Amino acid sequence: MLFRGQNILGYRPYADDVVDAFVEKSIANGIDIIRIFDCLNDIRNLQEAVDATNRIKQREGRGHAQVALSYTLGDAYTMEYWTSMAKKIEEMGADSICIKDMAGLLVPYKASELIKEMKAATKLPIQLHTHYTSGVASMTYLKAVEAGVDVIDCAMSPFAMGTSQPATEVMVETFKGTEYDTGYDQNLLAEIADYFRPYRDECLKTGLLNPKVMGVDIKTLLYQVPGGMLSNMVSQLKEQNAEDRYYDVLKEIPEVRKDLGEPPLVTPSSQIVGTQAVFNVLMGERYKMATDQTKDMLRGKYGKTVKPMNQAVIDKVIPGEEIRTERSGAYVENEMDKLEAEMKEWKQQDEDVLSYALFPQVATDFFKYRKAQQDKVDLSKADTKNGAYPV
């Protein structure tokens, strides 16, 4: 499971008790490996989730804390930076490391160098996750495997390539007959691909899959935009009937990223940077309008960035406000009791509180639907607060 550290699955920092409860329920419901990352690579924001996983592992023998480093480019992201982070991850008690290359920026020979250096810096297993957006992912995997990486993430061919991962079948065939042979049966893999191919075609037909994000865009290497961010940006522009501003926004993204301390572009920082770039382009003036998330990033609410933020932007967007310097969770008081009190009329299991914590409106709509199905009533005519239902 991909887990955003102190942000869990949401877009804001949550209290430690919410992090602890979510990890516990995730493992209780069958999750084994929890891939924990922070959008700023701020190690402090990962510790609580790692500790929570390890407590359960010590108590029940279940759970694997995998810390993911969000790979990105920039003069601050040196080889020394990555090896230092690997050592810190081992020291904090993680079980393994994932290099999360969400934008497909890790090119083959750099991958070889990175894997060799990180394997020398830590004894932890290293897993590599990349995307095909820039077109180099399969070659990157080949060089990474030769350099000693332990695991590579792939996708079945109907949903591979583009903003997804390299195709499983291609990598299996690549290593066939070598010391890296997976032993997987291509005939069985073909059956799996055949099962999913009609669904892929249906997604294309309905528009759920946009052909724009299924090919290779070499400009990814220029603008450093990850696949999920690219898909989100296309949707935002489409909603505003501004798809013709696509490349204007792509050019603005690196500028916004620089203003915000050059963070890796991964959820939620990718959405923050991407949405602000869209605003800057469509408003015709940079930071004329700033999202609440942009303001929180400038306030230090998400943690520490690898480089200082643009003071001129800070002065324009949040003039005179205090900048926070501690880990993101330090500013959020325990909230599980408060959240449970808010949604107590809908609670049927502990997991409901967590659903509400992360997605309050979506969860509430679901709880109402569930109640209607269970009681066979029309909730649009019911007074749920006072427990009055039409008959």
Task: Give the positions of each predicted feature.
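Glycine-rich phosphate-binding active-site loops on the catalytic face of alpha/beta enzymes
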Residues: 36-39, 101, 147-164
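Catalytic cores of alpha/beta
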Residues: 77-89, 134-150
